[in-house]
């Protein structure tokens, strides 16, 4: 797996993520792109980029903090087990008024 940024917040450089993804996929490598800086400034086409995962932070697009988006190809999302799920993970719930 490789993880790369789409657009650098330090230099402003836009990386050639499509070309990097094509090369990585030719070697069987999964590609994760950090799109937190790129998403607000670039036109995104996930089918064209062909990355396996693309992460976006909403606060970089003037959204609320603590929210984000993780795009993933269907084949990978179907293989990943949930990290946590449903109410079954709750042992104790109290209401404090």
Regions found by a protein language model. Give the residues of each.
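Pyridoxal 5′-phosphate
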Residues: 1-95
